UniProtKB/Swiss-Prot annotation:
Pfam families referenced in this protein's UniProt entry, alphabetically: Thy1
Family membership: Belongs to the thymidylate synthase ThyX family.
Keyword Flavoprotein: yes
Organism the protein comes from: Rickettsia felis (strain ATCC VR-1525 / URRWXCal2) (Rickettsia azadi)
CDD domains: ThyX
Complex formation: Homotetramer.
Protein name: Flavin-dependent thymidylate synthase
UniProt keyword Metal-binding present: no
Taxonomic lineage of the native organism: Bacteria, Pseudomonadati, Pseudomonadota, Alphaproteobacteria, Rickettsiales
Length: 294
């Protein structure tokens, strides 16, 4: 039977629906479903004052205005659902964004697959001396990176072997030793390392997705979550191109400047030589402001 729909569809998104987009070594993102497009945002905004459909350039201008002035409700009219496979340690960071509906693969009911994440040597670096939550920019020497990878792989394989031994079952659920009862899956899973992969369905509205992407596609975000965010940016661009363009203009490539920062800029425009000491800003604020202006 031929399927028909009266709802808005986006051809560029229909093309990738259900298709896995590879991320990291064993991860992926799949678009499972979506609701709305750029026109749904415009429709929601215009109902506030009863105006009809406008020209595309006016729609684009309205979306720019809404995003620029932090109007949020119209963007909440669009939803998207993803199927995502990701390392457990990234899932725990990801779930800090509490504005999505999530259902995760349960290692209480099922046996977790034998797939774990190993970083590329170029992404193995020491702890930053400046930022307490991230790595340095320079990679470890080849020998150091190889040692790290060997330890990570050995630990993951050993723990998965013990995981199966504790359950007395292989990854397909087959009994290993008929004379051993094993322990419950909900207990055996505690021994697995955090680089093992989990999966979940993640449904979120566009407003909250953009907030997630603003933080996680940022160069300061951890590499392993940033690569997922970068793939999602490509999906958003295909789904809502006007919104993506406005988001890139006002959020990704734009900047928020404090009152003191604006005062510094005004003084500089007038020809005054402003220094950190005379700015009234903290060292970090001053450095961030100077970075904005190159």
């Amino acid at each position: 039977m031929h399927n028909t729909t009266k709802r808005v569809t986006v051809p560029a998104l229909e093309e990738i629906l259900y298709e896995p987009i590879k991320v990291l070594d064993h991860g992926f993102i799949r678009v499972i479903d979506y609701m709305g497009d750029d026109s749904a945002i415009v429709q929601a905004a215009r109902v506030s004052y009863g105006k009809g459909t406008k020209q595309l350039n006016q729609d684009k201008g309205l979306i720019n205005y809404l995003l620029r002035h932090y109007h949020t409700t119209p963007f909440e009219m669009c939803d998207i659902k993803f199927h995502i496979k990701l390392p457990i340690f990234i899932a725990r960071q990801w779930i800090r964004h509490r504005t999505a509906s999530v259902n995760e693969y349960s290692a209480r009911y099922s046996i977790l697959g034998n797939e774990f994440y190993l970083p590329e040597p170029a992404n193995i670096a020491s702890q930053s001396a400046v930022n307490k939550q991230c790595r340095e920019g320079d990679s470890l020497p080849k020998e150091g990176a190889e040692k790290v990878l060997a330890i990570l792989e050995e630990d993951a394989k050993q723990c998965y072997g013990h995981y199966k031994e504790l359950m007395n079952a292989d990854e397909d659920g087959n009994i290993i030793d008929e004379n051993n009862t094993g322990i419950a899956r909900e207990l055996a899973r505690m021994n697995l390392t955090l680089n093992y992969y989990t999966e979940w369905y993640w449904k979120i509205n566009l407003h909250n997705l953009l907030h997630f992407l603003r933080l996680r596609a940022d160069p300061h975000a951890q590499y392993e979550i940033r690569v997922y965010a970068e793939k999602m940016l490509e999906i958003v661009k295909a789904w809502v191109p006007f919104t993506y363009e406005a988001f890139e203009e006002y959020r990704l490539q734009g900047a928020n400047i404090s009152r003191k920062g604006l005062d510094v800029i005004k003084r500089m425009i007038k020809g005054e030589k402003v220094t950190h000491e005379s700015s009234g800003m903290t060292k970090r604020e001053w450095e961030e402001l100077m970075k904005i202006f190159g």
